[in-house]
Structure formats: structure tokens, C-alpha cells
């Protein structure tokens, strides 16, 4: 093999390696194969077999959803911040499209999951708020850089500002969570 061929092979290998690294990100790295012990191509029966004792219903967009009680660790948080319930949303292709871990509704749980998500995935890059209210009653922080894989941490509060709901969602269909998003930047603006 001559030097030109060897050089071309090395250049091609480095290009492929760098292209793969450029498309990888913390959300994709963690959830590319699936979430909560199931692959993204899991169907209804596989979900129900892994998490028995749940119930099927429809979400607000008429998509099939399966919710089952499940106490397990989330993002290696301490035991007091375990999941309470997992809800699996079925996509248009009949497979798992997203999983929402419902947490105990408390400010410590919300802060723990937000802070750990920022540590693991970096700063969130999109947000959704209840803009109709004077004081926002719901907020969602999203990590969307690794589309189609998306992580969302959401909460809803009562009139006094106490959390009523704390959720951690991971999806492989970014379009499910794209509605009403406002992109945010954590970079300081030039004066």
C-alpha cells in the first residue's frame, strides 16, 4: 500500500469518527437505545409485560398511554427522589415514543431532578410556560439539541406556588414536545 492510499484511508476514518462524535450528545448518548429498560421499538405488550399492573388510556391528543406504578432511581438521585409512576406514550408507528416518570410533587424533588438534569445534559435550550397566567402555573425545561431524542423536566404549581406535579420525560419523537417552545440561550448577550 502506498503513502497516498494510507493517507486517504486515515483521513476518511478520522472524518467518519469526528462526524459521529459531532452528532452525539448527552441526551442521545444516554437514551439512544431506549429508556427505563425498554427499547424505543417496544410495543404495547412488551411495555405491559415489563411494567404490569398499569392502565391504558388516551392523552390529550388521543394517543395511547400506559401508566404503571414504579418506584425506581432516576438519574442516580437519592432514594427520596425515586419515580412514583411511569407513563408510556405510544407513537404513530405503534411503538414507545416517550416515557414520563412522575415524581413526588415537592420542591426538593423538582430541584433535584432539574439540577441533576443540568449536570448530566448541560443547560436546557428550550422552555415552555403557561403564558396565559399572570403567575405561571406550569413550566417545562427541555433539552432538544440531540433530536430526535428530547428530555423534558416539567412541573405544575397550585395558586400558592407549591408543586402539584413534577415530571421527567424522555422521548425519541421530538415533535411530541415541540409545540409552544421558546428557544433559550444561556450565553451572555453582548452590551
Regions found by a protein language model. Give the residues of each.
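Bacterial N-terminal signal peptides that target proteins for export
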Residues: 1-11
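N-terminal signal peptide c-region/cleavage motif recognized by signal peptidases
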Residues: 19-21
